[in-house]
Amino acid sequence: MANSERTFIAIKPDGVQRGLVGEIIKRFEQKGFRLVGLKFLQASEDLLKEHYTDLKDRPFFTGLVKYMHSGPVVAMVWEGLNVVKTGRVMLGETNPADSKPGTIRGDFCIQVGRNIIHGSDSVKSAEKEISLWFQPEELVEYKSCAQNWIYE
């Protein structure tokens, strides 16, 4: 399949606490993407600081790390045609107030500081984030029986 790629998606502590894990996974599955990695964990502050290293000079960095460390997260790797770009569209804007209805943030969020989900913003950042959160042996290679019904 041409342009098949992987993206990193993380359901943040507020999404876990609000019971939205199943709904979010359902949306990605129904779209036709394939789940190839999944972890439920309490992320360490060191992991979070590395993950958000590009934001380290921003005034909200310390609060972001504290928030992400405040509860469990669901870390996932999804695979499919243009999954990075399409995944970002499915998430909605970082600020939920700017997100359209039908997007995850548009349907379930109100405030930017509690926007329930993270998604890689480029193929390059997806590769970095996946390697940070997952070991290669934790990612599963398989062909979905639905693949021929999703892709030409």
Curated annotation (Swiss-Prot):
Localization per record: Cytoplasm; Nucleus
Enzyme Commission code(s) on record: 2.7.4.6
Pfam family of the protein (one): NDK
Active-site residues from the entry: 118
One GO CC term, this protein: nucleus
Phosphoserine, modified sites: 120, 122, 125
Binding residues annotated for ATP, in chain numbering: 12, 60, 88, 94, 105, 115
Function statement: Major role in the synthesis of nucleoside triphosphates other than ATP. The ATP gamma phosphate is transferred to the NDP beta phosphate via a ping-pong mechanism, using a phosphorylated active-site intermediate. Possesses nucleoside-diphosphate kinase, serine/threonine-specific protein kinase, geranyl and farnesyl pyrophosphate kinase, histidine protein kinase and 3'-5' exonuclease activities. Involved in cell proliferation, differentiation and development, signal transduction, G protein-coupled receptor endocytosis, and gene expression.
Protein name: Nucleoside diphosphate kinase A
Natural source organism: Mus musculus
